[in-house]
């Protein structure tokens, strides 16, 4: 018998959900709907009214992932994602800052990596000279060359959430947004402890969700960094600390990805496109479906697509 659960939430959480399910979105949206997504054993439909319906065998488990951040419905207000009380000051680009960024959240294969970096204001010219900028504009060779120098120049904290642990935490009701928040907070906390007694003038997080939602995700954590913490989208263009964090996160991710390919005994593609489905199907044939959680993020729609290719 198919279950059906409806929760009431707000526009911020719905936008977060849409981002979370971006690889599973259906081209069809019902009247009054914002999006429809299909994941294994569950269909999720979000409506403009703030209601979200979960249908299918895993409806209860899927809904549980979002209910903790949906307890206080708010009226949807049209405003910029950067319009909030946690926006950085105009002068932040010249300040001594801890910046954090993550890599691997949109890749079916490979881990999620988060890095926090401290850049003293006096180091900014040096980082520019090293070629530090958004890692998306650099190839793997450039990333490696810059990262190897950065490792000896800036204090940092690097965290890797491997696939098996990622899937385990996800199955316990932690959506990807919450996992990112936990890793960012932990990386920043670790770095601040490593730096002590030196204190940064602020902390800049490359914004992946609204700050209020970020702190809701951390509600049960014993240590939460709140002092002079700022959020901004495209944080790498706001301060070089985020750009440096992005480079070190990508460097770590690429190393982990190469190790994973060796473990698989075959080259693994990045991203979440059709080539990933084909590679996953080959991996299942080669190692068996029970080994899949070691290599992939199981909740991606690619899992179902890979199994379809084997039929």
From Swiss-Prot:
List the Pfam families hit by this protein, alphabetically.
DUF3378, RNase_HII
Q: Where is the RNase H type-2 domain?
A: 95-311
Q: Does the keyword RNA-binding apply?
A: no
Q: Name one GO cellular component term.
A: ribonuclease H2 complex
Supply the PROSITE patterns for this chain.
RNASE_H_2
Listed A to Z, the keywords are: Cytoplasm, Endonuclease, Hydrolase, Magnesium, Metal-binding, Nuclease
Which Gene3D superfamilies does its entry note?
A: Ribonuclease H-like superfamily/Ribonuclease H, TATA-Binding Protein
Record-annotated residues binding a divalent metal cation?
Answer: 101-102, 206
Q: Which reaction does it catalyse?
A: Endonucleolytic cleavage to 5'-phosphomonoester
Q: Which cofactor does it need?
A: Mn(2+); Mg(2+)
Give the EC number. 3.1.26.4
Cofactor note (record): Manganese or magnesium. Binds 1 divalent metal ion per monomer in the absence of substrate. May bind a second metal ion after substrate binding.
Report the locations given in the UniProt record. Answer: Cytoplasm
What GO terms describe the biological role, i.e. biological process, of this protein?
DNA replication, removal of RNA primer; mismatch repair
Name the family: Belongs to the RNase HII family. RnhC subfamily.
Q: Give the protein's biological function.
A: Endonuclease that specifically degrades the RNA of RNA-DNA hybrids.
Name of the protein in question: Ribonuclease HIII
- Gene symbol here is rnhC
